[in-house]
């Protein structure tokens, strides 16, 4: 089930960031960033929650991308799914939710950058 990220998700976000992305950003710093970014309309934070357990299984974080050469769109800053549930359509659902929000806002595109060494991520993005 898709929903907004919440302050109660901090531990799960920290775990997913560490396990899926290899980032070791402290839970305290994660909580601080989540609180700040949640209030900023230029950031969109969407969660995927297991309907039975209510556990956070993944999230997408996008920011508004604006320039002098195009209309506004979204720039994906992070898309992460717990490794234990990857391959079950969660990442695709998160991207579809982001696409719906982009359409609702009248945005014309969604973009992202992915590091060269993240070959699994590249294959996923090409597939969706």
Language model regions located:
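Short, cationic motifs built from Arg/Lys/His that form the positively charged side of catalytic pockets
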Residues: 1-6, 86, 118
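Acetyl-CoA-dependent GNAT
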Residues: 4-72, 77, 95-96
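Conserved functional loop/turn residues at catalytic and ligand-binding sites
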Residues: 9, 78-80, 85, 89, ...
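Conserved hydrophobic beta-strand within the GNAT/NAT acetyltransferase core sheet
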Residues: 76-79, 110-114
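Conserved acetyl-CoA-binding loop-helix of GNAT-fold acetyltransferases
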Residues: 81, 87-100, 123-127
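Conserved active-site alpha-helix within GNAT-family acetyltransferase domains
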Residues: 92, 104, 108, 116-128
